[in-house]
Amino acid sequence: VHAVGDRAVRESLNGMQYARKKNPNSNITHSISHLQLVNPQEFPRFKQLGVIASMQLLWATAESYTEELVKPYISAMTYQYQYPARSLHKAGATIAGASDWPVSSPNPWNAIAQASTRKGPLGVLNAKESIDRESMFYAYTLNAAKALRLDQQIGPLAPGKQAHLIVLDRDVFKV
């Protein structure tokens, strides 16, 4: 499900809760994409319902969109929870990394860096919602595979799993 605003997120979670109640033996993996605005009351529901938070954290930046087109129209409390990666993670949600391609770059390195710094041309967007690089590596590997229901085939480097490897010229946890 694609949900940007807090009401859309709440209604999506309500729908997924209803689906789980009506089909308790279903192995369907539910996920919500984008999650720009999430009410803190909803954070624990992601874990409770097994809903994956599919986040495009390349957008978690202080720029004209977030500062001029969003901030004036929402409450201060709502504003402080834009792209609430850390809060969702701390509440036990599974964070999956994703792009918003073709609207933005599909390059995961950019999103991983952005998720940890949240820096933009107009400052930092809610630094307390930054998330560490290690968590973002899981988001773009194992957790993304879970969101696609491919975690039995891909995700971590493990015996019997498919893998695409790259060789890097630096320690990406220290860049």
Model-found features: residue ranges?
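Short, internal active-site loops enriched in acidic
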Residues: G5-A8, L37
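His/Asp/Glu-enriched, well-ordered alpha-helical/loop segment
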Residues: R7-H30, P44, M55-K174
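Aromatic- and carboxylate-enriched substrate-binding clefts and catalytic-loop regions
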Residues: I28-N39
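Short amphipathic alpha-helices and their capping/turn segments at secondary-structure boundaries
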Residues: V38-I52
